[in-house]
């Protein structure tokens, strides 16, 4: 079963989204940072009309839809890769999921606290992405250190080290692993290492009700960013 982690800065609407997705979910969603400490988890069935039609054609008595587990993860702040806030907990929870749903605040409301004191969705995205990049960079450097002695005697270790050097250069420039063009063989190696920025990501914009139909300037910026990154919004 696919596991998707709902992430973002504190107090941007992660638990609200979780409650909307998961039937009978009662995750605490309050107007203050770090409302969520322990991750909330819930399983959602994915409706698919094609599955129902196939079941009808085959007279199946038992139709089981695909399911996704959503994990509402504690908010991340600057310095999370170094353990700030709930950083270590946040990063370990993200390592356990298959995909990331990044919630971004795209509405103005003086009564709703923003940890940065201002609404700037692209800045919010940069904070999260930078921390994930830094966490990957730290993990990569530790991995290279561990295999350093094997490089001269093992072709596999040497091949991995060359790949890691290539990825390290990209991460240092702020480029996520998912954005790097890799061969099928290289992707297999990377998958085993579990880099955070290699996980597929969807940006979920949190809008006022009045902007739900057409979006606003904030959500347009997020959509453009996602398009340039070849991700979904």
Q: Residue locations for each model-derived region?
A:
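Ordered, soluble secondary-structure elements with a strong preference for glycine-centered loop motifs
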Residues: 80-84, 134, 212-216
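Short, conserved loop/turn and helix-capping segments at secondary-structure boundaries
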Residues: 84, 118-122, 216-220
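Long, charged N-terminal accessory/stalk domains
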Residues: 87-192
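Conserved short-loop catalytic and cofactor-binding motifs
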Residues: 78, 128, 210
